[in-house]
Structure formats: C-alpha cells, structure tokens
A protein has these predicted regions:
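Active-site histidine-anchored catalytic micro-motif
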Residues: 1-137
Length: 137
C-alpha cells in the first residue's frame, strides 16, 4: 500500500473563515500516485473543521449564519471562566466536525458533481494545520 502525508498551513486574516481546499487536496492525491484508495483530510485544531459541500457563496454565508445562531460569538460560556474567550469556536467546530474521508478512484478524488472540500476556521488569526493523508494502491 502506498501512503503520503502532507500538511496544509493556514493563518486566516479573520476570526471565522471558510477556505476551499479541493485543489490542494487534488494536488496531493496526484503526487501520491495512488489510483484506488482514500484520502483523510483532518483539521489538527479543536477550533477548526473540515467539511464537504457546495462552493457557492450564498450557501457559505448561510452556513456561517447558521453556526453563529447555534453558537454565538462572545456568549457567556462556561469555557470563558478559565480565561479563554473562544467557547463558540469549540462548539462550531463540533458541529462541522474535524475530518472527512474522500474516496480516490482512477487517481482522482471521487466527489459528487457539486461536492468540494473546505477548511472551516472559527478562531483564526493564528497558525493552524490540516493533515492530508493519502492511502491506497
């Protein structure tokens, strides 16, 4: 079995951001030489996530508003009693989840017509990483 592990690095300019990363993942899959297998894409932080959905600006805004409604910024969270101020970021990351696994078929990501991979940042303006691990034959 072939494997390849690479890391994507992020430092967003805003507190919350949604970054389309399908092209970067495609490049890593191509570099791996894997024809049949899978790729794991995982945020290595507890205030960020990875998800698959449409790359449509209205939908991205809807996702952001929905998450903000469910876990508002600056609410009085118990987590803040520890001196932190990012309780909402942890909750938003739980809703998005931290990883996806995408099949590789004939050397390409086997995504649906409108499916794209995104990095979701909920506590930005600092260095963060995403691991991309390709496995297969």
């Amino acid at each position: 079995m072939k494997t390849l592990t690479e890391y994507l690095k992020f430092h967003t300019k805003t507190h919350r951001a949604y970054v389309h990363i399908t092209p970067q993942v495609e490049q890593i899959v191509s570099k791996s030489g894997v024809k049949e297998g899978m790729v794991l894409v995982s945020a290595m932080h507890i205030t960020a996530g990875i998800y698959v959905n449409d790359n449509e600006s209205g939908l991205i805004e809807d996702i952001d508003q929905w998450l903000e409604h469910l876990a508002p910024f600056r609410k009085n969270y118990k987590h803040h009693e520890t001196g932190e101020d990012n309780g909402d970021s942890h909750l938003k990351a739980l809703l998005i989840h931290h990883e996806v696994i995408v099949p590789i078929t004939a050397g390409k990501l086997d995504l649906g017509t409108w499916q794209r991979i995104f990095y979701a940042e909920f506590d930005g303006q600092r260095d963060k990483r995403v691991i991309v691990k390709v496995m297969g034959e």
